[in-house]
């Protein structure tokens, strides 16, 4: 408890902007005000009074590598607090969530969206998405906010996707990238698997510098590593937010095999708590029991908090 909050605190109030840079969401528009589009005062603040404008902390748009021709407009709300998450965060979460839902709703008819569409001209569909960052820097905070609010009942009508990002998930991605950079061996890019909706050979790419929004609060992040000294030497890295156990390791080996079919190099699976002395035999047994023995031979296990933990 609090481990992730301590790391978030090291970045301070600019943590969200720093994070966006790490995941390739560079040069986002900041501090945008848009008009509320509701004529009957449906959108209200927490005091129940009608609002006339909405604030967007960050706005980032990109063409999706997972869905052919889709322009993703990411409307970001950043809530950085010096207090820990409340013991009962549901009420405050609903306030933040509903505010973002209303903002995404009004963005659809805003002048700001028209400006975005003028810049991006090669798309066939548009997807407006909300991302709520709720972060704090208190070491005694329960970092796993998402699991606490997972069953929160939100009485609001919406037809857009909203992603929630907490301390745990931000620090997870920071840690993965810090680990890779500390190795001083690879150029990294995020891996884009085949989804059945990104099949156009003209636009299809299997990796890039932009983390798809669909992964932003994922418990697993796939990354392509290219050797600095030999670009033809490619390693497939899978980072897990959850701790090591035999079942998780087996599952991630299967996932890595399915995703990396056209890659020929090493496969690395990273956990936050892997310990060679404690887990080596468990990892060996799992690899022995994996259906594809040849593939299992290419797999190594690391603790991405420790560069010396390669198995």
Predicted regions and their residues:
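Intrinsically disordered, low-complexity Ser/Thr/Pro/Gly-rich regulatory segments
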Residues: 1-55, 60-311
């Amino acid at each position: 408890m609090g481990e992730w909050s301590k790391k978030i605190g090291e970045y301070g109030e600019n943590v969200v902007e720093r994070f966006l840079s790490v995941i390739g969401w560079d040069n986002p528009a900041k501090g945008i005000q848009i008009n509320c589009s509701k004529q009957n005062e449906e959108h209200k603040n927490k005091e129940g009074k009608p609002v006339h404008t909405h604030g967007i902390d960050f706005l980032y748009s990109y063409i999706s590598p997972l869905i052919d021709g889709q322009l993703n407009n990411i409307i970001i709300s950043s809530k950085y607090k010096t207090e820990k998450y409340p013991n009962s965060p549901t009420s405050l979460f609903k306030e933040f969530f509903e505010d973002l839902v209303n903002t995404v709703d009004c963005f659809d008819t805003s002048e700001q969206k028209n400006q975005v569409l003028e810049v991006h001209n090669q798309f066939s569909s548009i997807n407006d998405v909300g991302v709520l960052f709720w972060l704090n820097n208190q070491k005694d905070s329960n970092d796993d906010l998402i699991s606490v609010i997972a069953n929160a009942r939100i009485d609001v009508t919406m037809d857009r996707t909203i992603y929630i990002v907490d301390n745990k998930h931000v620090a997870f991605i920071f840690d993965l990238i810090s680990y890779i950079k500390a190795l001083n061996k690879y150029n990294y890019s995020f891996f884009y698997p085949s989804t059945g909706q990104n099949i156009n050979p003209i636009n299809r790419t299997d990796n890039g510098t932009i983390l798809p929004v669909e992964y932003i609060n994922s418990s697993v992040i796939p990354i392509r590593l290219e050797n600095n000294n030999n670009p033809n030497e490619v390693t497939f890295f899978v980072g897990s937010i959850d701790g090591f156990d035999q079942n998780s390791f087996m599952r991630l080996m299967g996932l890595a095999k399915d995703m990396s079919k056209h890659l020929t190099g090493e496969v690395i699976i990273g956990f936050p708590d892997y310990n060679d002395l404690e887990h080596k035999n468990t990892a060996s047994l799992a690899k022995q029991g994996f259906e594809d023995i040849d593939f299992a031979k290419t797999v190594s296990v690391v603790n991405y908090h420790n560069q010396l933990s390669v198995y």
